[in-house]
Amino acid sequence: PEGRWEDFETYWSCSKQWEGKQFGEKDARSGLYNQCNFGIYWTAEAMKEAYVLSGDAEWLDLGEQALAEASLYQQIWQAPFFPVPTVGGFGVMTSDDEWNDARQSLFALTYLDYYRLTGNESYRARAEWALRASFYMMYCPENAGVRAIYERVHPHFDERDYGFHMENFNHHDGTPVDGLGEFTIFDWGCGAAAASLPEFK
C-alpha cells in the first residue's frame, strides 16, 4: 500500500545511494520511496500463480493492482532525445535513466498471461509492445539506426555479430558510449527476447 518497491538493485547496483537517495527514506522531491520495478513484476507473477492455483479472484485483483504499477514504467512514447526506438520498452527504477531494459521480455509474458486470464485488451497491447521493444537494441540489419550506433562504438562489428544485444539503452558508468552501456549476457538481452517470442505464437 505504500508503494515501497525497494530491492538490492535500487541502492546497491549501478544506481547507488547518495545523500539524496537513501535506503528506507522517501525521495524529498516526489514523496515516494525509491522504486525498482522487479519487485512489482515478481509480485504480479506471484499473485497470478496464486489465482491460477486457487481460483480465488482476490489474488487476480491483487495481481492486477501490481501490474497497474508496473505499467507506469512502460514507455508509451518515442522519446525525442534518444536515437533508438523507445515505444513499449521498460525503464528500470525511479532513480536511474536506463530505457529499453531486457526485463521487458519478461514483462511481455506477464502481460500476455494476464490478457489470457482476463480478456483485457490493454494487457495484450502492452504485451505486444513490450515484446517488440525487446528487439530494439539488437545489432542486426533490421535496426539500421541502432546498428549504426553499434558500429560507431564498436568499429570491429560486422555481420558475424548480428544478434548481439546490450542489456538496455543509456546504461553506463560515465564513459561516453553513445548510450549503449557496457554489459550484456545471452539470457539478459537477445536470449530473453528470443525465448519470449514463441510464447506469442
Name every feature range the model reports, one short phrase each.
Residues P1-K201:
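Glycan-recognition and catalytic cores of secretory/periplasmic carbohydrate-active enzymes
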